[in-house]
Amino acid sequence: MLAPLPDVSLTDPAPSLSPLQWVGMQGIDLPVTVAEPGYWRELHARADVQVDLPAAHVKGIHMSRLYRQLDSLAEESALSALALRHALQAMIDSHLDCQSRSARMRLSLDLLAQRPALVTHDLSGWKSYPVRLDATLAQGVFQLRLQVGVGYSSTCPCSAALSRQLLEQGFLQAFAGEPLVEPDQVASWLRRHGTLATAHSQRSEAQVSVDLACDAPDLGILPLIARVEQALGTPVQTAVKRADEQAFAALNGRNLMFVEDAARRIQAALEGIYARPRVHVRHMESLHPHDAVAWA
């Protein structure tokens, strides 16, 4: 007859009698399903899960029990606030012998969405958006927060003004003394000298986080991304042809922005619609070896 396997987490006393705020695991690979109107996809996530350990005399928690609850979550038809709450409650219930009363989970994943070209018909590509979900159930109170990352292009307003000045000076010098300049002369000069100076622009990124309602039918990831991209006006593109690149250049020209402008645009687009919106933007400067950043 096989002897029972020892469990030192139950039999060995803790070396010092003190409660622990959180104990658990980080970086667990997990398949999850994200389903929203017009979108359904199984994605790879990494999960961090912990419970509190208020029982000072208990040596350790039961990691495998947390793992089982994550497996159950992966089998859900789709991620939702309700599914996350149920998973956290099950983690707490599985640790009654540890007197646990709180549990938390973080899911990090990349959401893939197909994006059409700006102009060219039947041309599209896939774009990845980093997404993070932070769910906490503490003393019976459930909280869920969503964070998304959005890439965009930013063109410096100051650099654009300096470039326009050089273009103006070049034009005046080229046609100095001519009482009448024909439109085709202007067009010809612009074709040759329109890039006499160009404003510096760079790839930029925004991190936006909001609270989600505990009874929300879905996570609303794509609507949040769409609102941020619309506020900025220059989301980075996927597949493009020359016509799309030209349209993107026009968008950048109409949406000159400092890092402060970007943060304020996003904040204004979220206020009154989402609870506790927070914004962090970063412009990876092409003029400088450092980044410009702002928080709202």
Swiss-Prot record:
The keyword Heme does not apply. GO terms for molecular function: GTP cyclohydrolase I activity. It catalyses: GTP + H2O = 7,8-dihydroneopterin 3'-triphosphate + formate + H(+). Pathway: Cofactor biosynthesis; 7,8-dihydroneopterin triphosphate biosynthesis; 7,8-dihydroneopterin triphosphate from GTP: step 1/1. The record marks C156 as: May be catalytically important. It holds the Pfam family GCHY-1. The keyword Hydrolase applies. Keywords: Hydrolase. Its EC number is 3.5.4.16. GO terms for biological process: tetrahydrofolate biosynthetic process. InterPro entries: GTP_cyclohydrolase_FolE2, GTP_cyclohydrolase_FolE2/MptA. It is an enzyme of class 3 (hydrolase). Belongs to the GTP cyclohydrolase IV family. Converts GTP to 7,8-dihydroneopterin triphosphate. PANTHER family: GTP CYCLOHYDROLASE MPTA. This is GTP cyclohydrolase FolE2. It comes from Delftia acidovorans (strain DSM 14801 / SPH-1).
